[in-house]
Amino acid sequence: MNAIGNFLVGTPVFTIFICLALGYLLGKLKIGSFTLGATVGVLIVALLIGQLGVFPRDTLLGDIFFDFFMFAIGYRVGPSFISSMKKFGAKIVYATLIFLVSAFIVAYACFKMFHIGPGIAAGIIAGGLTQSAVIGSSLETISKLPISDHLKTLYSNQIPIVYTLTYVFGTIGVLIFLRDIMPKLMHIDLKKQAVKTAKELDMIPVPVIVASTHFYTINDGSSLIGQTLGTVNTKFAKGLVAAGLNDSADMASVINAGDVLAISGGIDEIGRAVQEFNLLEVTGKTKAYVSKQVVLKKNFSADVLKNAQDKGVLVATLAGDVMDPAQFSTLKPAESVTLVGQKDAVSEVQSQLGRLRAAENIINYSWFALGIALSAALGIVGTKVSGVPIALGGGTASLIVGLVQSIYRDKHAHMDTIPDSLLEFFQSIGLNLFIATVGLSAAKTFISAIQSMGISVLLIGAVISILPHIITFVICYYLMKMEPISIIGAQTGADTLSAALNDVSERVGSDASPFFAAAVAPAYAIGNIFLTLMGPIFIVLLS
């Protein structure tokens, strides 16, 4: 056993990544509808493996990946934060702040009443309020406290252990309250209420008929023979354009039997035109026709849309749904459209409308690196509380910078971005690699810490998990008269409870899940920032 322990301590790269591998597997295990999740799985594995030796924590490695994690959260939630605020207004923010203030007051009262120390308090906030980022921000604050190294080690080791103990009720207990108990208290059917409100707010997804270009041979006897391409364009139904003839977009071209006509539009409209004008589809594609996404440089009138269609260019939404003139004229600068048609004609129209939108799958490495660099600089900004310096911290700064950068990029979509798949990777691996380093270093004190803390930590954690939700529900529903699903969404986001987001989204169904996610988004961003700061604040107040 000593040989295994020595090997694990001596090869930290192997140890950390075996914790990740086994932790992700453990996190997938289901108990009923509950899954531990990757973070708890990695922490449990790290605490178990950590019993085999003394593992010093690599703070630089952990901090870098923790910053990656927080930056990814901010970047992913940025655009939805703004759109959700526009739809729901200030009430979601009020509900979020009510929850956060309630959580702080309840937690502070419990900590004082039961004489809870700084490390245990931060662990309860992290686990009971399901905000694992508190672990990183609290460890950073502990390192700056004017206390002995022994106490710093004690507090640092207590945090991940208490997090593990309180996380289960913080997830399951609160999930049951939000998903099952609150709807009954409000006398609603979760799915029916969500669909009803989503319809009222025009947030039910509408099936999109994607515009594309298809090619057809002009048969003998077709009524289009002898007409110009421009004339045919005027005869087509709304939502269709004659994009080109024999790969040319010259609207003066005369149509003859055997020519190949390109038609852009929705497949249903194209099908009706094929029947009406006696056309035969040609298989295969040609490089002469393209689809390009364009970022508008200013407001345009409906006449601009008509001019584009007169040139054989179809204008559609980003999703590919054909736009009508009224819809086009309401678009604002920095919004995007899709142009479909012959490449020369599309290029001409694109130059009038704005810049090409950058592809979403191209990684802007400079943008990402700049974000992390700015986060490190912003993270040192802070103040002193009771003589102890409290900085924003690299993690919280990363979340804020990610949020700002994503909103900026959303307004300047010609810039390359950071693909969501990469952000998802950083969000998951960044947090869990950090958690693995923390768990390994704290493992040796795990058993003794549980024995010394007893059942009281679980009970205090349960109170801090659930009581702020009850207070927020009473105020928002009975006093503020908020819409029920918005209340559940705000409390889910404020508590950064991903399990509730996933579970309630499934319960309300695919039609209403975008509405519920939109209610969660602004609260989630605010909750991430303030809960992450709450741990360090309690560290200072209780030291």
Curated annotation (Swiss-Prot):
Origin superkingdom: Bacteria
Keywords of this entry: Antiport, Cell membrane, Membrane, Plasmid, Transmembrane, Transmembrane helix, Transport
Subcellular location(s) of the protein: Cell membrane
Membrane topology, from the record: Multi-pass membrane protein
Secreted listed as a keyword: no
Cellular component, GO annotation: plasma membrane
GO molecular function terms attached to this record: antiporter activity; identical protein binding
NCBIfam families: Asp_Ala_antiprt
Function text: Catalyzes the electrogenic exchange of aspartate with alanine.
Annotated protein name in UniProt: Aspartate/alanine antiporter
Originating species: Tetragenococcus halophilus (Pediococcus halophilus)
Gene (name only): aspT
